[in-house]
Amino acid sequence: MKKELLASLVLCLSLSPLVSTNEVFAATTNKETKENVSITNEIGYEKVKDMLEQQKYDFEHNTPLAHPKESKLTDSDEGVLLYSALSKVDKQKFHEFTYDIDDVKTSEKNNKLIVEAYITRNFVFGVEKVTTSLGDNIKLEIPKTTSNKQSSQSTNTSNLSFSQVKNSSNQLNVIPLSNSSKQLNVTQLNNSSSTLQYENDEEYSSDVKLDEFLKKYKQEVKNDDKEEVKSEDKPVSMNFNAANSNQLTVTATSVKGYSGYAAMKYAEKYALKPNKNYKYYKDKDCTNFVSQALRAGRMPYFKEWKPYTDAWVNAGAFRSYILKAGGIKMKTVSDTYSNVKLGDVYHYDYHNKIGLRYADGWMDHTAIVTSRANMKLYVSYHSTNRLNVPREYVTSKEGGKRYVSSIRN
């Protein structure tokens, strides 16, 4: 019996170090995995930052398309379109470009580093310094180099910021990141061959090029100026003609107690980061967002307009409902700077129900007026997330017609 107890004791003592070693190994492995994920996400963040730093430099030097490999800017990028419209057509002074990076997730697939993030790009323009912002979900795919030659070459680029600074000889200098040594130990990345995708384009969204866009935008602004002059010379027409007019008027009683200012403040707050207390409809959230803003402006619920009825979430159904007798009563007013107020609603009609590009009277997009400044009207909307873009922007990019509805107490 004693021999058996002694043998058991020896066996336990001999096994205990093995169990301890395995536990230590498992703990070490888990710790290393977490550290690798953390380091990889840090790399992803820095790569997105490199791209945006290059954009910042190029916008600030009025050369947005100077370094497309590093900035990923193209002549159909919405940042380029808006920057060019405000600076070249509206002749507004550019003050500042800033950005934010959120929700970075980094993974590896097919010898590429895949970086997903939500970025916000902010442009400050004009005497009244209006901030126009674009919020986008992006995917940045960065090829990993494999050969020694490639690794040697990428050492000078993959761990360096692509924020470029021109020196006196007009050469481009590359500014190194502070944590480049940590990145170098993990992987070598070929930034110049990376690709950028925007993950939240609206259904049927146009990829209009800069020259075509500016031509349309210039004409839109010219037409708006003409309408402004007309509105000063004569009263607004009371005729309703959906087929031929952008300035329709429908008689309707006002909703007492509605605050356009309160609706505007809500829209400002949640234009770029949706309110988590409401549902969010990926790629189709514009009318849901505007309905939320109207509700924040003390608009009462109605039988057909409440979360999440067709009239609450669908651009066409919303427009159709507000023009009917009963419920919300909104007036479709003359689309002029002097007439449109904060908290008014814009409706855009730019394709038919199967996606062909012509206006058919059924609205495709909804936005809310959030700024009246620099003698311009600015709207905010979702899908994509935009804050304070000119009212002419959507029709210049997508085509079609726009209408504006107002609630006056």
UniProtKB/Swiss-Prot annotation:
Signal peptide coordinates: 1-26
Domain of life, source organism: Bacteria
Entry keyword set: Signal
Keyword Signal appears in the UniProt entry: yes
InterPro entries: Amidase_6
PANTHER family per record: EXPORTED PROTEIN, EXPORTED PROTEIN-RELATED
Designated name of the protein: Uncharacterized protein YjcM
Organism (species): Bacillus subtilis (strain 168)
